[in-house]
Amino acid sequence: MASESGKLWGGRFVGAVDPIMEKFNASIAYDRHLWEVDVQGSKAYSRGLEKAGLLTKAEMDQILHGLDKVAEEWAQGTFKLNSNDEDIHTANERRLKELIGATAGKLHTGRSRNDQVVTDLRLWMRQTCSTLSGLLWELIRTMVDRAEAERDVLFPGYTHLQRAQPIRWSHWILSHAVALTRDSERLLEVRKRINVLPLGSGAIAGNPLGVDRELLRAELNFGAITLNSMDATSERDFVAEFLFWASLCMTHLSRMAEDLILYCTKEFSFVQLSDAYSTGSSLMPQKKNPDSLELIRSKAGRVFGRCAGLLMTLKGLPSTYNKDLQEDKEAVFEVSDTMSAVLQVATGVISTLQIHQENMGQALSPDMLATDLAYYLVRKGMPFRQAHEASGKAVFMAETKGVALNQLSLQELQTISPLFSGDVICVWDYGHSVEQYGALGGTARSSVDWQIRQVRALLQAQQA
């Protein structure tokens, strides 16, 4: 129970804490986000104390009623913090004492803030993972729906930012959607490891008062119970794993944003962002800036920084709880907010994006079919390495003559290889080009349709 100073640990101390240290030590400015889960954990723990014979039924009911009142004040915005509330646990317990009196002092029996805070954090992150999963699934669904609707749109595929081969626009969309399905799968795995109960571990050695941890697990709907009390109160690998998940997901989203930023420039003019996800210039009236995509790209760095920062905090800690672990919550809250905003904006961008199909088609050029020319010779029986060389010679001949690759005459092609014949004309058809990539995972329509079915099946399985 809080001492006269309002501290949960004040009995050992005589002098007052330096005001600068008081401010430096406090975490209430951000861990107030945990108010709801802190109340949930305390309600479950009071039931555990009652079962262990450490609270009477009347005392438990009094505490539960008081905690309901605390939660009501938080929900209605009427909860008043005071200067001694260094963290959410202190604030809630102080208010509980004001509401129900000395009985509130029994709630912390056998419980440490070490196991209390990590329980709160796991509860909060478990819900956050579920929320972010829903947002990520919605983005992937939006991308797949778009890919299905625009399957017949062709445009240049790029490697090294150089035009490479004709592909379906849908194939590009699905390349990013598939990456995001791995992110959604990873997030489910992270949630599974978060969903483990540490409450009942005490500060380091465990709980000596017969509290039933299985009851606590059931009350808070955790999937399992931590195996070791020292590990339970000090380990933050689940936080690091969440931050790494966010970093990897942001890597994928940043790459997609970078592509779209390029595609919406005048130089490409393949797509146009909706006004709802663009801004203008304060000086240049003609400008339409892709700020939504640029912010997605830039916020990846913010998330990476939080992940690296936490790992640097964790790597030098001795065993069990240290105050350094207070740094975990700001990282989690900020990254969670960032991911929520980014996923919603990305979904809005994709759902409202306008494509310029004519410009995409005009960007296709015969030189992008040089690989197809090599495949043509392979189908005639030429080894691929020779076919690659022959196609390269055709490209050089066309460049030397200042003509497009498909403008070389049959006679000119036959000077390179006698295997060229009149049916080489089929090579110069972009639709024919993409359709030859019918192997699973390719850009042919049958393969794109298969990819769409597979991604939808993955989403359905993940949501089951």
Curated annotation (Swiss-Prot):
Catalysed reaction equations from the record: 2-(N(omega)-L-arginino)succinate = fumarate + L-arginine
Residues recorded with modification N6-acetyllysine: K7, K69, K288
Protein name: Argininosuccinate lyase
EC numbers, comma separated: 4.3.2.1
GO molecular function: argininosuccinate lyase activity; identical protein binding
Gene source species: Homo sapiens (Human)
Positions marked as site (Increases basicity of active site His): E294
The organism's place on the tree of life at top rank: Eukaryota
Key word Lyase present: yes
Annotated GO CC locations: cytoplasm; cytosol; extracellular exosome
Keywords linked to the UniProt accession: Acetylation, Amino-acid biosynthesis, Arginine biosynthesis, Disease variant, Lyase, Urea cycle
Biological processes, Gene Ontology terms: ammonia assimilation cycle; arginine biosynthetic process via ornithine; arginine metabolic process; L-arginine biosynthetic process; locomotory behavior; positive regulation of nitric oxide biosynthetic process; post-embryonic development; urea cycle
Listed result of changing K51N: 2-fold reduction in activity
Phenotype when changing D120E: In ARGINSA; severe
Keyword Amino-acid biosynthesis set for record: yes
UniProt binding sites for 2-(N(omega)-L-arginino)succinate: S27, N114, T159, N289, Y321, Q326, K329
Effect of R12Q: In ARGINSA; 18-fold reduction in catalytic efficiency toward argininosuccinate
Effect seen on changing R113Q: In ARGINSA; complete loss of argininosuccinate lyase activity; no effect on protein expression; no effect on nitric oxide production
InterPro entries: Arg_succ_lyase_C (IPR029419), Argininosuccinate_lyase (IPR009049), Fumarase/histidase_N (IPR024083), Fumarate_lyase_CS (IPR020557), Fumarate_lyase_fam (IPR000362), Fumarate_lyase_N (IPR022761), L-Aspartase-like (IPR008948)
Pathway(s): Amino-acid biosynthesis; L-arginine biosynthesis; L-arginine from L-ornithine and carbamoyl phosphate: step 3/3; Nitrogen metabolism; urea cycle; L-arginine and fumarate from (N(omega)-L-arginino)succinate: step 1/1
